[in-house]
Regions:
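Bacterial N-terminal signal peptides
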Residues: 8-19
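Boundary at the C-terminal end of the N-terminal hydrophobic targeting segment
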Residues: 18, 22-26
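Short, non-transmembrane alpha-helical segments in secretory-pathway proteins
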Residues: 25-59
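Active-site-adjacent substructure of cysteine-protease-like catalytic cores
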Residues: 55-75, 258-318
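Catalytic Cys-His active-site segments of thiol-dependent hydrolases/isopeptidases
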Residues: 82-84, 88-98, 312-331
Length: 343
């Protein structure tokens, strides 16, 4: 029996679709707060520092903000609003956590940069952004991935230590993202032949899915629970020939796809957005999410997951940073590109 998994293996940033400019333009803080209140009760502007992300239009003469970002003063949650309604209204939101410009997943930082470029484009070139309209198969899909995993302990329980410093190495964002997809499917049941055996959970010939937790943040987990997720991470890294490091772990996506096909009984095909007409790429994402298949994304040095969408078509993103800044985002304004499907 083969398992359905949906994977995206590359990202191309920012695809804009010019349209006739209507009666639209800048969105001030007051109007942005009004939009934000639909998602959080008491929006307060996210503090920006010289060391953090400055969502400013570098080419706009009055240096007005490209984005308005708000946290919920009375609880958890955040909202990101475009400062020009020719780009769109709410670009991202979450009912959990809060945005910290100095502690943000790198792929989210890249997405905010793409949003900023979109606003720059409409301001400088006086165009409006009209993303392709795609109707999802279902009204919405709740997040399919319950895991909020990361790259450090206990996920790196069995990763090799540095040969020079003896320090533990990271699992790598690619391995963590794919491990979360496999966890969502609880697939495979048995560990592949040929992986290194050892003591404890490493001696098992199966994956101990029942002992893996949605989150290990804050501690409170048992040794067996830590080992269970560590085995999955180590097997994926080993089979994909990951290059481990104390500052970061690299993984060739092609080798990971080969490992998934050969060891995990999956088949892989690739779709490139630039070669697809209209909104076919976005439709493919909606379709797979509607079938219960998380979408794996990677581009540059980052990997993360699409695992749901809301009534407005914003896609839920799991950044792979232990749940940090997970939320719903507009992936149509800052368009993305290459997709791979694993069966």
């Amino acid at each position: 029996m083969k398992k359905n998994i949906f994977i995206n293996i590359f990202i191309i940033v920012l695809s804009l679709f010019p349209a006739v400019v209507g009666l639209a333009g800048p969105v001030d803080v007051a109007k942005a707060k009004e939009l934000a209140r639909k998602y959080i009760s008491s929006p307060v502007s996210v503090a920006e520092t010289s060391d953090g992300f400055m969502a400013k239009s570098r080419r706009y003469s009055d240096d007005s903000p490209a984005l308005h970002m708000f946290n919920n003063q009375n609880g958890e949650g955040f909202v990101i609003v475009a400062a020009d309604d020719r780009v769109g209204g709410v670009l991202g939101y979450s009912d959990k956590g809060s945005l910290d410009t100095q502690n943000m997943p790198a792929p989210l930082m890249a997405l905010l940069t793409d949003y900023t470029r979109a606003v720059e484009a409409v301001r400088v070139d006086s165009i409006s952004v009209t993303p392709y309209y795609v109707k999802p198969p279902k009204a919405f899909v709740k997040p399919l991935v319950s895991a909020e995993w990361s790259q450090d302990y206990p996920y790196n329980y069995y990763t090799p230590r540095s040969s020079t410093s003896g320090k533990p190495t990271y699992t790598g964002c690619t391995i963590t993202a794919m491990a979360q997809v496999l966890f969502a499917h609880r697939w495979p049941k048995m560990r592949p032949e040929g992986v290194i055996r050892g003591e404890g959970a490493m001696a098992y010939d199966y994956y101990d899915w029942d002992n893996m937790l949605d989150s290990y943040s804050g501690g409170g987990y048992s040794e067996a629970q830590g080992q269970a997720v560590g085995v999955l991470m180590r097997d994926l890294g080993k089979l994909a020939q990951a290059t481990y490091g104390v500052n970061g772990t690299l993984c060739d996506e092609g080798k990971l796809w080969n490992a998934l096909q050969y060891y995990y009984n999956c088949s892989v095909r690739q779709l490139e957005k630039d070669r697809l007409p209209g909104g076919e790429f976005l439709q493919a994402i909606y379709q797979e999410l509607s079938l219960g298949c998380p979408v794996f994304m990677t581009g540059g040095d980052h990997a993360f997951l699409y695992d749901g969408y809301d009534e407005n078509g914003l896609v839920h993103v799991n950044w792979g940073w232990a749940g940090l800044d997970n939320g719903y985002f507009d992936i149509n304004t800052a368009a993305t590109a290459v997709t791979t499907k694993i069966r």
